[in-house]
Amino acid sequence: MSNVRSKICGITRIEDALAAAEAGADAIGFVFYAKSPRAVDVRQARAIMAELPPFVTTVGLFVNASRCELNEILEAVPLDLLQFHGDETPADCEGYHRPWIKALRVRPGDDLEAACRHYAGARGILLDTYVAGVPGGTGEAFDWSLVPSRLSKPIILAGGLSAGNVGQAIAQVRPYAVDVSGGVEQAKGIKDAAKIEAFMRAVKQA
């Protein structure tokens, strides 16, 4: 049985958040990026969080948000963890009194250990698929052999994961956690409870 943690990202509906919690997800993610088909506003996020059972970590995903915008959201939504998914510098990620992780879009030749050191304050590094001009949510997997066997920060593996490949991904990369969005959807922003359950079962059996 795997002890790899899991996050279901791109939650937009209460029923999807509850399905994730029921299936055993450790965290759910809210996308505060207006260009995403999975974007939520403050009102939606608050309503969903009000229905969550305890011990489910709430993560806010941001893409090059201004400090003013991010502070306004944090005043209204009590997020547990921040995920920076754009071109943010380490300084951009600090100062919010929340733990944070930094997403990197992986390309051949990237020095991921150098990136871990660069984002020294991050609690973990999320590795996602590189597609030019797209910050994330591509639904495509990347070449997992690009991930070194040892890195100095916990690794959250994302990018094209599903119930069909997450077991292989865990076996190959040995991440701290996995992150899924499109792989458990029936449409963008609309999750499928059966796919969530199948994904979580595959994670636990890995």
UniProtKB/Swiss-Prot annotation:
Keyword tags: Amino-acid biosynthesis, Aromatic amino acid biosynthesis, Isomerase, Tryptophan biosynthesis
HAMAP family: PRAI
SUPFAM superfamilies assigned to the protein according to its UniProt record, in alphabetical order: Ribulose-phoshate binding barrel (SSF51366)
GO BP terms in the entry: L-tryptophan biosynthetic process
Keyword Isomerase appears in the UniProt entry: yes
E.C. numbers: 5.3.1.24
InterPro entries per UniProt: Aldolase_TIM, PRAI_dom, RibuloseP-bd_barrel, TrpF_fam
Gene3D superfamilies for the chain: Aldolase class I
Domain of life: Bacteria
Reaction catalyzed: N-(5-phospho-beta-D-ribosyl)anthranilate = 1-(2-carboxyphenylamino)-1-deoxy-D-ribulose 5-phosphate
Any one GO molecular-function label of the UniProt entry: phosphoribosylanthranilate isomerase activity
Pathway: Amino-acid biosynthesis; L-tryptophan biosynthesis; L-tryptophan from chorismate: step 3/5
Natural source organism: Pseudomonas putida (strain W619)
Disulfide bonds: none
PANTHER family per the UniProt record, alphabetical: N-(5'-PHOSPHORIBOSYL)ANTHRANILATE ISOMERASE (PTHR42894:SF1)
NCBIfam families: PRK01222.1-4, PRK01222.1-6
Family affiliation: Belongs to the TrpF family.
Protein name according to UniProt: N-(5'-phosphoribosyl)anthranilate isomerase
